[in-house]
C-alpha cells in the first residue's frame, strides 16, 4: 500500500511539471495564431452551444462534488464564473485557442485549473471575449489522476509498480483551426469543426516508454477505494472485542465506497460527453482527480488507523491467549488440588468416624460416672452452705476491722496534720522573730559603724592639727635659736647701744611667748593622743561585739532553720506514709467488698444451677481468698526509699546554696557558665535550623527537577 501511494505521488509530480510546460507553450502559441473571419463566423454557433452545455455540466458536477467532499478535512472548492473581456476585432480577426491551465503546488498540494473559452463575435461592435472558468481546490494532501480514453473499469484492479521513474504525462490541449479564405464554403467549416473534435479527443498521451500502461496507472489511481476494500478482505480476520469498532469500520467503508462510486459515475459521465464538451471534460476530470486524491489521503489515514487497531487487537489476542494458557494451568493445578483435598477429606472422614465411636464409648462411661457423682452432690451441698456461712462471717469481721483501722488512721492523720500545722506556725513565728532580731542587729551594727567612722574622722583631724603644731613648734625653736645667736653677737658688739638692748628684750619676750605656745601645743597634743587612743579602744571593742553578735545570731538562725526543715521533712514523710496506708486500706476495703459481691453472685448462680440441672459443674468449687497484689507489699519500702531520695536531694540543694552564698566567685562562675551554655545552645539551634532549611530547599529543587 505504501509503495502504491508513493507511485501515485510521483505520478502527480510528473503531471504537474508537464502541465506547467504545456501551459507555457500554449500561451506562446496563442499570441501567434490568427484564424480567418469565415472560420470564426461558421464555428460561432457550435461554440456557444458547447459553452452552454459545459456550464450545465459544471453546475451538476459542482453539486455532486460538494455533497461528496464534505467529509474530507481541509478541502474547499470554489468556482469562478467565466469573466468576459472586451476584445476589439474586425471581420478579418480570428478567435484564440482553447487553453487548459493547471497549477499544482508541491508544498500545499493545491490544484488550480483554469479553463478559458473564447467566443467569436458576430460583428465588429460586439464585446464578447473568451470565457474563463477557474476552479480552486485547496487540500494539504490531495492529488489528481486522469484516464486517457475515459473508460474507468469498476470490476478489476491492477496493482501499480512500486515506483514510476520513467513515466511522464504530457497534457496538451490545443485547438488547431485551419486558415480559410474569406469566401470559404460550408464544407471547409465542417472539416475544421471535425478536426477540432479530433484534437480535443487526443487530450492526454505519453510519448515515452510504456504508453499502454498510462491508462492502466490512472485507472489504478481512480480505484483506490476498491483496492483498499480488496486488501481489507484479504487481511486475516482478527477477533474484535468491541462492537463499536466494527460499526465504525463498516460506516467508514460504506461512506468511502459511496463517495468513490459517485465520483466514478461522474467521471464516466464526463468522459462520455467528451465530444460535446471537450474543454469541460478536462475541468471535470481535474476535479474528479482532486476529489480522488483527497479520498486517497483519507483512505491512507483510515488505513493507518486500521493498521493501528489491527496491531492493538493482535496484542490483545496475544494477551488473551497468554491469559487463557495461564488459566488452563491454574485449572489443572486446581483440579490436582481438588483431588488431593478429596483424598484428604476421605481420610479425615474416616478419622472422624473413629473419633465419634470413641466419643460414644466415653459418653457411656461419663453417664455412669454422673450417676455416681449424684450421690456425692447431696453431701457436698451441705458442706458448701456451711463454708459459705463461715466465709460471710469472716468477711464481715474483716470488713469491720478494716473500717475501724481506717478510721484510726484517719484520726491519726488529722492529728498529725494539726500538729504539723502548729509546728509550722511556730516555726514561722520563730523565723519572723529571728528576722526582726537580725534587722535590729544590722541597724545597731550600722550605727556603730557610723560612730566609728565619725571618730576616725576626728582622729584624722586631730592628727593634722598635731602635725601643724609640731611644725610651728620647730619653726619657733629655730627662731629662738636664731634670736639667741643674735643676742650673743649683740652682746659682743657695742653693749651701750640702747636700741639693740630694746630689740634684744623684744626678742626675748617673743622667745618666751613662743616657748609658752609650744608648751600649750604639747599639752593639747598629749590630750588629743589620749583621746585618740580611747576612741581606738572603743572602736575595737565595738567591732568585737558586733562580730560576736552577728556570728552568734547567724549560727543560731542556721541551727533553728535546720531543725525546722528536719521537722518539716519528718512531718511530710509521716503524712505520706499515712496517706499511703490510707490508700492501701481503702483499696483493700474496696477489693474485699468486690470479692464479697462476687461471692454472693457466685452463690446465687450455684443455687440456680443446682436447681436447673443435677450435673456437677467445676465452676462451683470453693475459691481461695487471693492475697494482696505485689505492689501493695512493696508500698512501705517504696515510701521509705522515696523519703531517703527526697532528703538526699534537699540536703544537696542546701549545700549548694550555702556554697554559692559564701563564695561570690562561685556564683559569678555559675552565672557565666549558664550564660555560656545558653548562648551555645542558641548558636547550635540556629546552625541546625539553617542546615535543615538548606536540606529542605535542596530536596524541593531535586523534586522539581525530577518532575
Curated annotation (Swiss-Prot):
Pfam families: Golgin_A5. Residues 287-424, 452-608 form a coiled coil. Residues 1-664 are cytoplasmic. It is found in: Golgi apparatus membrane. Residues 686-707 are lumenal. The chain crosses the membrane at residues 665-685. Residues 22-106, 121-196, 234-256 are annotated as: Disordered. One of its GO terms (cellular component) is Golgi membrane. Residues 56-67, 139-150, 185-196, 245-254 have a biased composition (Basic and acidic residues). It is a single-pass type II membrane protein. Residues 38-47, 83-95 have a biased composition (Low complexity). GO terms for biological process: Golgi organization. Keywords: Coiled coil, Golgi apparatus, Membrane, Signal-anchor, Transmembrane, Transmembrane helix. Residues 68-80 have a biased composition (Polar residues). PANTHER family: GOLGIN SUBFAMILY A MEMBER 5, GOLGIN-84. Golgi matrix protein playing a role in tethering of vesicles to Golgi membranes and in maintaining the overall structure of the Golgi apparatus. The C-terminal domain (558-707) is necessary and sufficient for Golgi targeting. This is Golgin candidate 1. It comes from Arabidopsis thaliana.
